[in-house]
Curated annotation (Swiss-Prot):
This protein's UniProt keywords: Ribonucleoprotein, Ribosomal protein, RNA-binding, rRNA-binding
General function of this protein: Binds 16S rRNA, required for the assembly of 30S particles and may also be responsible for determining the conformation of the 16S rRNA at the A site.
Subunit field text: Part of the 30S ribosomal subunit. Contacts proteins S3 and S10.
Name of this protein: Small ribosomal subunit protein uS14A
Xref: Pfam families: Ribosomal_S14
Top-level taxon of the source organism: Bacteria
Gene: rpsN
Cellular component terms per the entry's GO annotation: cytoplasm; small ribosomal subunit
SUPFAM superfamilies: Glucocorticoid receptor-like (DNA-binding domain)
């Protein structure tokens, strides 16, 4: 489990990215890099890290399910993820 402060910081960044999305898009289209530079650093989508919604783990996150590989495996074995079943061949 990740530290609560790290998860909170990531949520704050996500909020800022969503807040400044349209403005950043307009400024980039105009080519106004001076105004872009004055925006908060955390408003850049590059600074976001995909984290597991269950554990907050930053690595090994499956995009489709927004879960880490470990949490995905646990939930899949319990049958808590619809449409997912263990394959065998």
């Amino acid at each position: 489990m990740a530290k609560k402060s790290k998860i909170a910081k990531e949520m704050k960044r996500e909020k800022l990215v969503n807040q400044y999305y349209e403005l950043r898009k307009e400024l980039k289209a105009k080519g106004d890099y001076e105004a872009l530079r004055k925006l908060p650093r955390d408003s850049s989508p590059t600074r976001l890290t995909r984290r597991c919604k269950v554990t907050g783990r930053p690595r090994g996150v499956l995009r489709k399910f927004e879960m880490s590989r470990i949490a995905f495996r646990e939930h899949a074995h319990k049958g808590q993820i619809p449409g997912v079943k263990k394959s065998s061949w």
